């Protein structure tokens, strides 16, 4: 039974997900339905957490919008996500960057990872 579930989940998983880590700046393009219209909406920010669980994998992106911190959790293999683009690689030493929630301004900056 377990093999059947694994096979079905494998078919549902996206193959074109780029490699990104916490600290990376990414742009996620999401399909949004407003009434009868369907359009793409971009959400750009820093990845602060990644949850790797196969088909149920998710990642959290944080950005500052109008001086207010906004976090959004995306399911990695969701059909709602059109594309994920890595804009900038960040050099961090933690897996979860929840400490960025308390920081603003220059202290919330992340060094760029080279190479």
UniProtKB/Swiss-Prot annotation:
Mitochondrion in keyword set: no
Gene Ontology BP terms: translation
Recorded GO MF terms: structural constituent of ribosome
Domain of life per record: Bacteria
InterPro entries: Ribosomal_bL19, Ribosomal_bL19_CS, Ribosomal_bL19_sf, Translation_prot_SH3-like_sf
GO annotation, cellular component aspect: cytosolic large ribosomal subunit
Alphabetically ordered keywords of this record: Ribonucleoprotein, Ribosomal protein
HAMAP family, per the entry: Ribosomal_bL19 (MF_00402)
Function in brief: This protein is located at the 30S-50S ribosomal subunit interface and may play a role in the structure and function of the aminoacyl-tRNA binding site.
Protein family: Belongs to the bacterial ribosomal protein bL19 family.
Record protein name field: Large ribosomal subunit protein bL19
UniProt gene name: rplS
């Amino acid at each position: 039974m377990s093999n059947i579930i694994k096979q079905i989940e494998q078919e549902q998983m996206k193959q074109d997900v780029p490699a990104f880590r916490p600290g990376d700046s990414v742009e996620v393009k999401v399909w949004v339905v407003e009434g009868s219209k369907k359009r793409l909406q971009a959400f750009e920010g820093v990845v602060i957490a990644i949850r790797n669980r196969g088909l149920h994998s998710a990642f959290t992106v944080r950005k500052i919008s109008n001086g207010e911190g906004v976090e959004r959790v995306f399911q990695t293999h969701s059909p709602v996500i059109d594309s994920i683009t890595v804009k900038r690689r960040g050099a961090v030493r933690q897996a979860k960057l929840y400490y960025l929630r308390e920081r603003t301004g220059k202290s919330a900056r992340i060094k760029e990872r080279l190479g």
